[in-house]
């Protein structure tokens, strides 16, 4: 049994402990400051200003423009939060109607709500005046990239949800470009609540031409400069680069990446995509102020309206105090926009989203000695950020996370009316139990689920426009990771496979499940949910696909690279691992089954091998590992990427022993958490992965770009690839399997999840899963 398998149990135990613990980081040695309790309970007032409304509850005061539904002012604690605006990316257009949907005069000041509706049966939607793309289309920098034609014989195609590699085709227009879409945006303010709700309803009538959004989000843009601390999760909770230092930085590789030449993080690279997040796991995220000791945070009370399901990773902020809440986008290859054809009646309600404000009751100020120490250590790689700042901002974020739990627990909201939003009695709860049936698994695997994710999604369908889903590698077939059109309902199951999916809208769905330690996916079609009728699916047998006896494995399948070296939350999001890889593994990787440890001997991404170290900051103590201060700009101010950013081909070797001559078919199963650059059939194209065995090439994986490397993450849209070869190529004794990434840009290559070699020698028949489960959607050809 391999060492990787022996480590399997202990790693899962650690993972289970982590998942069961609170996401809120708590210092062990001292108490955090207290967050001020809300004591104001004034009635909500609504003032009509002619071209706008002002909503005020004595805690939050906001002004909504009638012409487009944007916020022009947002005041908390006497501080104007906005310097540019807060808005939905696609604004109401066409025939615009502004109205009061909840008048506080009719409910004793308990709640006020205003609405701006744009009816647009055929004109392209107005672009945002603050920078949104015309008609919600995709900016040029985010236009989808397409996979090449289906792999030739002997090449491995993607085997994740959605099937074989997409077919080649011409690029369709980005965004609706003249399509019709009615958009209504609403803002709601309650008595005694330190925050407000906002939501939008998108409507496409059957008579409208095709329409859609390449990306869509709610944005709080360019807040007051007082907001200088970003909180995403326990690992990314920090003082941020100032506007001035960001402007002074030198662009490297892409406009959103800059080498900082001044400030706290001088000699580091700042990149907005370092602050991406898995939307399904995100609790509360936002900015706070070390000066004014206030915070503002976004909360999604539900994930039902977010495209891409629980695997959707997205950008949640821009630099300079901007908050983002994407409900659909092409980032990382998932939930890639929505595309509504002519003839379809379609509605989609996004939100209500909650925007939360808080303030400290007893926060402390940094001393002059603290500030002097910070100044003295700026640019060193270990800036001495004052502990009082850490405590203050952590207290604010902890409070926001606690608030998010209450906001989520109250979903769905009884006060929402007039849009396509069923209340509690118009929804249903779906329950059941998945039973793992994997008789061919190594004995140590067990029958419990360390982490099970299960959900209901729209049945697979053919994408009418063919663009964004092709980027994700499944042609025009849209499956849940790539669906931005329809609602999805997901939950975490228990270790024994039991699950409860609450608040499901009526409809017909496919049930999907995936779990740590189980390669592939469970799916059951034709699940019909009726309003107010609980649905118990009973016990559901899940027999994962196996093509033969397991010979070895590296890692364990969990759709991320976090189990591998540097793939964890302390590291993966930092820009520059493509440059630093060659210093960490100067001779690349040789991994020996039964001896090597994937946690330290297998890097989380395989990229071209750079032979330059011109990027190293000579003052850095550990340039290959430290978070900040590891890079130095060469003389001049031009982008150094042409000199730094190219690497030669990289080959990793896996050594393993076979006891005797083999016969039959060997099947290599490669699960990739992400990839970049491999949208071609030519194995020399950067990003593709060539596989060799004992000096002979056995195939090439033509990967599908997800921007996981370029955009600093340990996962994109997950794909599994199958490579068959004649088992006679395996020899008695030591064998060497190689994985080669071609020369190219060091942000191309693959992000690893899991590898497994199986052998079918014909001595046993391996059952084909039932059609209605399709754990590994495509069949093995």
Each model region followed by its residue ranges:
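Structured interaction patches on ligand/partner-binding surfaces of diverse proteins
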Residues: 516-545
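Beta-strand-rich ligand-recognition modules
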Residues: 496, 638-663, 671-778
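Beta-strand-rich N-terminal accessory domains
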Residues: 27-88, 171, 177
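A contiguous, surface-exposed recognition patch within enzymatic or periplasmic domains that forms
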Residues: 220-348
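A short, amphipathic beta-strand motif
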Residues: 428-439, 497, 540
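Short, acidic Ser/Thr/Gly-rich low-complexity loop/linker segments typical of extracellular
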Residues: 461-498
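A short, solvent-exposed beta-strand micro-motif common in secreted/extracellular proteins
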Residues: 497, 507-518
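Extended, loop-rich substrate-binding clefts of extracytoplasmic carbohydrate-active enzymes
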Residues: 47, 87-156, 162-207
